[in-house]
Amino acid sequence: MSLYRSPSAALLKSPSQAAFGAPFGSMSVADLGSLTRLEDKIRLLQEDLESERELRNRVERERADLSVQVIALTDRLEDAEGTTDSQIESNRKREGELSKLRKLLEESQLESEDAMNVLRKKHQDSCLDYQDQIEQLQKKNAKIDRERQRVQHEVIELTATIDQLQKDKHTAEKAAERFEAQANELANKVEDLNKHVNDLAQQRQRLQAENNDLLKEVHDQKVQLDNLQHVKYTLAQQLEEARRRLEDAERERSQLQSQLHQVQLELDSVRTALDEESIARSDAEHKLNLANTEITQWKSKFDAEVALHHEEVEDLRKKMLQKQAEYEEQIEIMLQKISQLEKAKSRLQSEVEVLIVDLEKAQNTIALLERAREQLERQVGELKVRIDEITVELEAAQRELRAVNAELQKMKHLYEKAVEQKEALARENKKLHDELHEAKEALADANRKLHELDLENARLAGEIRELQTALKEADAQRRDAENRAQRALAELQALRIEMERRLQEKEEEMEALRKNLQFEIDRLIAALADAEARMKSEISRLKKKYQAEIAELEMTVDNLNRANIEAQKTIKKQSEQLKILQASLEDTQRQLQQVLDQYALAQRKVAALSAELEECKTALDNAIRARKQAEVDLEEANGRISDLISINNNLTSIKNKLETELSTAQADLDEVTKELHAADERANRALADAARAVEQLHEEQEHSMKIDALRKSLEEQVKQLQVQIQEAEAAALLGGKRVIAKLETRIRDLETALDEETRRHKETQNALRKKDRRIKEVQQLVDEEHKNFVMAQDTADRLTEKLNIQKRQLAESESVTMQNLQRVRRYQHELEDAEGRADQAESSLHLIRAKHRSSVVTGKSSSKIFVTEDDY
């Protein structure tokens, strides 16, 4: 029983301890070597178990042979009883010879008692040897129990440390949940910003269409300007012809001078009326200037007010024409001869005054344009400085992004190594589970066989009791036969010879059986000594290994506590930084709202940015699709990782690595959030710069529109001058050289002003083109900042997903550790139950041996008694 108990107890302890100790190993090659050594030890224990099973089977076969021999002896005893019954009558005749046989019987009894004493001493010596061996095995079992209690104490301490780690993990999970909530809020804000960007893109498309229409109108105005230049050339030729005609008309004018003096008084009255009309015209022109200033502020009223003002000018012109016609009719009545000349003169004077007023307006507008150009140049310089700052920030962000990418590559490489180590540990763990299952099955078979042996021993004990009762009955019959022995001397003589022969055979069989038993006992003692030596070496090696593992676990627990304290400090710092970043984000949102309001005022002049925003939108869609694909890939990878971690998450070293990775991931998340906020601020600044550039462009375009309107008015005035020149040519014969010289100088001044205005218009157009190119460059920078923002957002999303994965891994590792603890407790209960069953089996075996010794003693005594009777 002790031979069976020790290896089974060792087998129960070693796999359970291996199953408990294996999760606390590290993922190095040394731990894999220790796992292989454990497998070798388990194989050796299994081989020892097989050898002990073979020995047990051999003992069972010998016990079966002995039971067969006992049955044969009982059969012979029954035959002997039958022969005694048949010879009772003959023994009655030989009662006289009984006295002689009694003496011989007493002598034979003394001899049998001496032989029984010798056999009893030998049996007691063998029993003492067995008891010594059993005591030694019990001492070894006590040592093993003490080792088991020590390991249980260590298990309790490890459970306490695991509970502390679970509490720390719970606090870390709460902090991670807060970070997730903050990340979700930031994601919602980013979505709102994306919606605003989409709305701005739609508005920019509309402005692009309006800008295209304006460009078409500018092209038409350029064509009209070319036509006007051609007309100016033709007018110059006509002016030369008019000069020649004026020389001819000068001679006629001297003749008409006297007549003109008479009409001069009437012309003075007409001039007073014309002065009043010019004052009214100047008032109207002043109103027109006020209307132009209001047009710049109120764009929606521009067209209506221009139309209204144009109608007022037309009405005034019509009134002037009517008055002029009335005056001409009066002059024709007064002086029919000079009516045409005076009409032309009055008309030319009124138009010259109008041109003077228009020229002053043009000079004022030119001065305004010059001031606006200087302001635009200053703003362009500021934009250049800001763009340089944006480029510097962009380069810094790109460097930070490259550093983050390098860190991500390192983390990916470490993650792949961890996955490979997890797979190897999963395979090793599966092998250990299979071997543990086989050992449990072998233990169940051994328990079943032990139960069968107990039943067999009980049956043999019953048979031995029956044999003892039969022997008692035979003794009573022997006493009856002693009274009748005198009548059976002849039969007893023959029976004595037969019994001596049988007794000799029995003695030979008992001697052979004793030798076989002694040989088996010696062999079992040697096997027990070998098993004991192996068990001691195995226990010492396991003790050293567990002590080393406990030291490693203490070191890992200390490192884990330090890492947890550092992680809590970093979490506090990051929470403060997140609060600061949230405040800055709110400020940036308010600034963005202001920028959007300003951008709404400049909706019509952002057409050049529509194509770039569309490209940004497509890039954003592509980034979103890539992000979704990455999330799908990440979910698949998470599935594979969860499958691997569900097997080996009971390893404390992996848990330590996961917690360190959690801290590094939180640090990376904080860095990425900082970069995200910095990129958001840079994008907001770039958008503000773009909005200011768009406003400047809008002002330049308004100035260009004013210049175009002025150019149109000048063209109309030139046309009117052409008509007036044609009329003057008709009336040149009646005019004077002074008026013609004034008109020529006025025309030259107007031409130079027109050339200067066209040159400035071209310069403003070139400046507008430069501004457009600069705005496009700024928009490209804004697009790059937006791309960086999208990339940073993707990295933030990936880090949040990784944080969730690590949280799940921590939860799974805790569940696996709890399962392992429950499994260790279950193994302990099973070990205690097995030890109790082994003790019960040992006690029952002692009882069976005692009963067997008593049955052997009674059997030998009965056989000696029959021998003495046969002698008589």
Swiss-Prot record:
Keywords assigned: Coiled coil, Cytoplasm, Disulfide bond, Motor protein, Muscle protein, Myosin, Phosphoprotein, Thick filament
One GO-annotated biological process of the protein: positive regulation of ovulation
Nonhelical region: region residues: 1-31, 856-866
First-listed, main subcellular location of the protein, grouped into a coarse class: cytoplasm
PTM annotation, UniProt: Phosphorylated on serine residues in the N-terminal non-helical region.
Localization (cell): Cytoplasm, Myofibril, Sarcomere, A band
Disruption phenotype: Defective extension of body wall muscle connections or arms towards the ventral nerve cord. Double knockout with madd-3 results in severe muscle arm extension defects. RNAi-mediated knockdown causes an accumulation in the proximal gonad of endomitotic mature oocytes in 22 percent of animals.
Top-level lineage group: Eukaryota
Region (Interaction with unc-89): 294-376
GO MF annotation, one: Rho-dependent protein serine/threonine kinase activity
Family, as annotated: Belongs to the paramyosin family.
The protein's role, per its UniProt record: Structural component of the muscle thick filaments which is involved in assembly and organization of sarcomere myofilaments. Involved in ovulation. Plays a role in the formation of muscle connections, also called muscle arm extensions, between the body wall and the motor axons in the dorsal and ventral cord.
SUBUNIT field: Homodimer. May interact with unc-89 (via SH3 domain).
Protein name in UniProt: Paramyosin
